[in-house]
Amino acid sequence: MSQGQGGITLDDLIAQADYLKRYIDSLQRTQLELLESINSIDSAKQAIETIKSGNKEMLVFIDRKGYLLAKVGGIIGDKVTVHLGLSYYAEVDLDSAIKILDKRKDEISKAAQNLNNELQKAASTYNQIVDILNQIQQAAARRQQGE
């Protein structure tokens, strides 16, 4: 079909499928980052609960991937420093820290849900385009066999 008849070209479909594939990959990477943030918040809350229980020693990860642990002793359990966002941190009591972390987790969870909805829409559109491209390919193969 030509553009003048209100249709789209095969090249347009292929370009759209390629764009959607890259977009889906980007959304999936962002989704993974959000899930990692939620897991980090859960770990932080668990550490606060350990401090609140009066435990004076704790094993902490030195790196992000958990290749190295260190035993930290002499923990004084009345205040912690919490990341508020951007480059801002605050020293707060343990209960306030948990409230801040819960609020941040809720925000990230909502963002993850919105992103998941967008990911589903993009994947659905991508699958529809791939189905159309497969139908075009099958029709072309049948035409070649008929020649």
From Swiss-Prot:
Pfam families: Prefoldin. It comes from the Archaea. One of its GO terms (biological process) is protein folding. This is Prefoldin subunit alpha. It is found in: Cytoplasm. Heterohexamer of two alpha and four beta subunits. Keywords: Chaperone, Cytoplasm. PANTHER family: PREFOLDIN SUBUNIT 5 (PTHR12674:SF2).
